[in-house]
Amino acid sequence: MLIKDEALRTAVAQALRVKEDEITPDKMKELINLQVPGKEIECLDGLEYAENLERLNAFNNKLETLDPIRDLRNLEYLDVSINQLRDIQALHGYRQLKHLDISRNNLYTMDVSSIAAMIDLKYLNMENSKIDSIEYLEHCKKLEEVSINTENVQYSFAILGTLKQLKKLKMARMRLFNVEDLTYLSSVEELDLSTNLMDDLSPLLSMTELKKLNISNCPYIKDYNILKQFAHLRILDISQNHPDSFAFLKDLKNLEELYMEQSGFTDMSLLNNLANLRRLNISKNEVKGLNKFTNVKHLTAFSARFCQIENIDFLKDAKELIHLDLYTNHITDMSVLKNCKNMVDLNIARNHVKDISCLNQMKQLSILSLEDNDVKDISVLSNLENLCNVDLYNNVIEDLTPLSKLKYISYLRLDHNAIHDLKPLSHLKFLRSLTLKANYITDVSPLKDLELLEALRLDDNPIEDTSVLESMQFYDKFTD
């Protein structure tokens, strides 16, 4: 066989639309784009004939060498992340490459000197790979996006300052005690320094075009006043940090997205000056003064998980909401959401809600989580034809009739309710996952024609006979 690895051979045959024994060196020249992620491929032998290949995605395999593709001079996109590569010497001379992902090849310290010749490279991801140096990047003047995270490195990052087209830089989880090497990076617009140990952000002041900054889980940063000097800052993540004061937020008037999960934030009135705010996450904080938070008109996404919220009247004018996550609070009344007609994803699980009639106008709703509430009447769901993922775990639902015409539902969780009759589910042809544990079901025959059903849980039900399900394609996977 021209291609030794069976999984690779099958994928190539599919890409070329031929039988495996019809793969020839000439036929391989027709291969332009090959996608083989997660196939457990061990070698690329045979791909040397694909001389016109432009894109190769081989992430999450078992590759130890790239030697078979060393002469593919048309390759511009290469993803070999999550493999077992010792080095990338086979890519020496790959001047044409524009996109390279070698992340998560962390079994060995890699020699990445071959990168020096990649003068057209625009994207480079080396996350979770043990690399010996980044000095080779000096020659890659067209780089726009770089991701690095190797812990306890001994080399300098100052070389990044020579990359004048660099727009996105990710250096998360590196245990950096200082970021002085970043002093001369003036072109960066998006920076991820999450999970590091520095306490001073002043080396970033040269990044006058900075628009997005992630410094979450950097516990030693206490003073954030310096952020006022980033005039173009649009997105900020300070989750898992604990600023000495949050007063600096009042001056970040251009912020569009703000993430402050588990940060000790309490005073919602500080956010009223952020007129451009669109996305906000304040989860795992004991927030106060919600009634004084009036800057909600333009919010499209709001997350407040584990905030001990009892009343959500402050959202009455949040009519542009698309994503709302209020998981685990003390909410009893959600009627204020009745005008959120653009809602796509709503999570109000683990609250004390009984009445969900306010969902009536949410015609775009596709993801709904109402687990651990007190809902009995779900008749309003019959109008929500776009629902595809529904979680109604642990309520007091008896009648499933409102679900009978929701033809796009693929995931449905109904455990711990009071359900007897499954007939309304018999026409949900796209249903792939269904859990019905701890109900009062005796007859499962309405499920027998659900051909796409892959996961089914029926534990703790007084079922009389399950033999009717034995002809279903995925019956062996079901957990009875």
Where do the model's predicted regions map?
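LRR flanking "cap" motifs
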Residues: 1-51
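Concave beta-strand-loop units of leucine-rich repeat
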Residues: 30-42, 52-64, 68, 74-85, ...
